[in-house]
Amino acid sequence: MSLPSKVRLIEVGPRDGLQNEAQPISVADKVQLVDALSAAGLGYIEVGSFVSPKWVPQMAGSAEVFAQIQRTPGVTYGALAPNLRGFEDALAAGVKEVAVFAAASEAFSQRNINCSISESLARFAPIMESAKQHGVTVRGYVSCVLGCPYEGEIAPEQVAMVARELYAMGCYEVSLGDTIGTGTAGATRRLFEVVSKQVPREKLAGHFHDTYGQAMANIYASLLEGIAVFDSSIAGLGGCPYAKGASGNVATEDVVYLLNGLGIETGIDLDALIAAGQQISAVLGRPTGSRVAKARSAQ
């Protein structure tokens, strides 16, 4: 299969990246980050999450962030809404696209959200119904697709079943997440071969963590399988809560550099992206997690 000519990147840094940060980050800093990402040419930015501040204190100001960002025409500003209450809060904040998530691992589902996979999927039914009524689009996430911290390996057929359910419920796209970063290029190709029998390839996305240094190889393997949508995080924000000190999300800057080298169009200005990553890294008081940004700044 030939490589896609164009790739769409889903920027998850402001949500998935910042949610695990221990230090408080101001609404103003979050707004500045989102605006910088819009200006760099990203077409989709996951801005925040409408969850209980008790569980994810870092996401407490998501409604304020949505109220203050400069919305660029043509850019989608999404939010995670894991339950109906979260969806209603997102709706009140003027959010036009939400994401829901399920796990491919029963043990992870029980430990993370305290219910079975089938129970978690059933919880999304009222969200999908309300989203349809209000003209809100819904994106689906499946976590632990290439390994689980509690169960170990996960069968691709299990991932396909969960992805199929999300797609059948009305998720226009389903992102497959290597939550603990143990996936390899071979396993990634097999995963998409199996899942694409249940969900069309053009409706699938890849979400890779770099915990074992495999994210770029897995993205390339996905491209070979015809996948043309990837989630990534500015400056590699977002560590891995299951491997202390290890890197988590793949850095958007590094993915753009890879795609540029392959002649694949993204519409993203790499220099502006690097600057946005350096800015939020300065706010956090640590170096960027992007290898490309580090190499550029050392020149």
Regions found by a protein language model. Name each.
Residues 1-299:
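Catalytic cores and adjacent flexible loops of soluble metabolic enzymes
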